[in-house]
């Protein structure tokens, strides 16, 4: 004989729903914490990749012909437009200048992402310069920079960094 007034499971259904909801909430919280902890590493990897590409491009430029600064009629030197899309955690990306120390080697790219600082050697015999003599310092955001290889009458090599035209 079948019972139609069986309500034994009626009390366990809400308890099961609450327990499942709590477990799902805990899993979502753990995933959110994992993503928050992974964000600095992802941002650093992005800047690592972009700075490495820029250093490789600069080394390539240094293997080509420079523009001679002492000859107004000289043809343009080897030139490259570089695009940077720096993530939110980027404190700086600098060419030939270390903002933390106020100096640094002029042939290096310095960058700092969420407190993690790195430096890449481009060339020990070359220097980064800007046409107006200021320091090129980028923060988070999107940038297009023009880098041109030039040399002076004494044979000193420079990579001129300016905003792309």
Model-found features: residue ranges?
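N-terminal alpha-helical signal peptides/signal-anchor transmembrane segments
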Residues: 50-66
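Short, glycine/small-hydrophobic-rich surface segments
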Residues: 61-89
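N-terminal start-of-chain detector that recognizes signal peptides
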Residues: 53-57, 82, 130-134
């Amino acid at each position: 004989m079948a019972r139609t007034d069986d309500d034994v499971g009626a009390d366990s259904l809400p308890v099961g729903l609450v327990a499942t909801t709590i477990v799902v909430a805990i899993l979502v919280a753990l995933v959110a914490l994992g993503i928050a902890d992974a964000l600095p590493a992802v941002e650093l990897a992005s800047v690592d990749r972009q700075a490495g590409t820029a250093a490789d491009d600069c080394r390539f430029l240094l293997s080509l012909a420079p523009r001679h600064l002492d000859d107004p009629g000289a043809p343009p030197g080897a030139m490259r437009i570089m695009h940077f899309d720096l993530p939110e955690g980027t404190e700086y990306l600098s060419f030939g200048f270390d903002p933390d120390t106020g100096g640094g080697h002029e042939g290096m790219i310095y960058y700092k992402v969420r407190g993690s600082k790195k430096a890449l050697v481009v060339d020990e015999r070359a220097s980064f310069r800007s046409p107006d003599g200021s320091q090129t310092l980028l923060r988070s955001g999107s940038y297009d920079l023009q880098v041109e290889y030039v040399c002076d009458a004494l044979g000193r090599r420079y990579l001129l960094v300016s905003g792309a035209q």
